[in-house]
Amino acid sequence: MEAGNGDSSLTANAKASIPRGERLDRALARASDAPLREGNRIMLLKDGPNTYDDWIAEISRAEHWVHLENYIFRADEVGNRFAKVLCEKASEGVRVRVLYDWFGCLDTPRAFWRRLRSAGVEVRAVSPPLLGTPLGVVRRDHRKLVTIDGTYASTGGVCISEGWLVTSPETGLPYRDTAVNVRGPAVADLDRAFAGTWAEAGEPLPDEECPSAEQLPAAGEESVRIIIQEPRRMRTLRMLQLLTASVEQRLWITDAYFLSMPILTQSLMAAARDGVDVRVLVPATNDLALIGALSRTGYQQFLEAGVRIFEYGGPMIHAKTLVADGRWSKVGSTNLNLSSLYANWEIDLVAEDSGFASKMEQLFEEDLAGAREVRLVQTWRGEKARPEGPLDTEDRRARRSAVGSGTGSGAILVRVGSVALQKSGAPLNTHEQALSAAASGALLGSSLLVGRFPRLVAWPLAAVGGLLGGIGLLRAARSALSGGVTTPPAPDYPESDGQ
């Protein structure tokens, strides 16, 4: 027994001898499967126009390869700017590879992809619907990533669409988003992330386009991790849990579609109750209106715990950023909701540098200057979460008409599953009751319409039912023939032409 106590004491003393920061760094590396890379130079990119200029300038200087991966790639003014420079580089002999998400680019015509391919650009779609995996549609490639020649990379929340060029007609505030570019050893991790998704959609990249971090020279003094989120891996979620549990002074978050998972919600509220300055900045008017409404249903519990919530007054704030204790900063594609943290391919850069964190805090404070705080207000029905001032009606209408990251009603349907899973076990508050009543009314109306005009939906439902039934029988037959053991099919994504 004495020996056991001695071992325990030695272990405790050993832990005490390791500085707290080093212990947290080690925990972050294990939780996120992301080693800390030193010797990098990183630069903030604010909003779409600055980000596009940076990306296009770097692409135009490419000599060996260009890797571009984005959830949305529109065939509009911005998309055509990128298409032009990508085609030019391909014609010069540069290996140009483009990954786009099948669902996110539903609105992009096939002719756009044909134009790129005819110029020599290799184009692949990620996660198109397949008969063998009908539920694979919930897995989306939500990344925004550019890597060039092993010397430059960039990631953030910016998609390729002229929606990122919008400004508010009333306030003059821009469509806000944040990206970051990086040079140095961390570029290898971003290339590795692209290589993983590229292999999901076809043949893998050649080795020369996947340099190791050890092969890349230092370019600065900043230390960063690249968190490569893949379906069901939850690496970003584990990192967020560690940070929220360890933060001591302040935690400032910007998120576009804030439907926090219960485990993260509890962590944020616990930090606020412990005296941490927890602030969350979200859009006042979301480009996915239903998601914005559902996000507000959680305001009250956060406010009661001491979390401060702000709503940005521009057309949209699409950034996915975080800064903690003036040391840790996150910039990337991951929203704080179930689909991003569990189901999607995402990518985030986490910097451990006080200088970069200071710039992130300054950017957050600039955004707060264009935001209104949500507070608890006493009403005749008790305390309710209310913003400090109403939005101008004309401005609200203009924002809702702006093109953003949503892909129509389909985007809402895919993402609303996240809400159902998060809300299913919780009692409804007043706002949720109103939303539930509206949804129930819509469902009832749809049912009456079907009852009155059954042929409108009979054939589509029969087709869907027959398809799913056939898939089920086929998989059961395969299982029986293989002795009850099914082997997951290898990814075999067809050469996509906008499908």
Question: Each predicted region: which residue ranges?
Answer:
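Membrane-cytosol interface motif
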Residues: 488-495
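Charged, low-complexity intrinsically disordered terminal segments
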Residues: 2-452, 460-463, 467, 495-499
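Membrane-helix interfacial anchor on the cytosolic side
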Residues: 467-487
